[in-house]
């Protein structure tokens, strides 16, 4: 999943997952922002699956043979 990461004017880092609207996180470092947004993205995808929704973002990770 593609992430967008940028440094804000106040020095904090913002990372977001454009494929999942609203999934964004701040961090004091670039790495911290990435870890936080990855964690949030996984939680959102897990909740979708628990609700019985498809999560096309996972299609590249899992393939039924």
Predicted regions located by residue number:
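Generic low-complexity segments that are intrinsically disordered, proline-rich and/or Lys/Arg-biased
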Residues: 19-22, 57
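Acidic-enriched, low-complexity/disordered segments with a strong bias for Aspartate over Glutamate
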Residues: 9-10, 28, 59
């Amino acid at each position: 999943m593609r992430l967008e990461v940028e440094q804000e004017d106040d020095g904090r880092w913002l990372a977001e997952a454009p494929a999942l609207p609203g999934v964004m996180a701040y961090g004091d470092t670039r790495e911290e922002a990435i870890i936080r947004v990855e964690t949030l993205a996984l939680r959102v995808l897990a909740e979708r699956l628990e609700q019985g929704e498809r999560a096309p973002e996972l299609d590249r990770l899992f393939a039924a043979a």
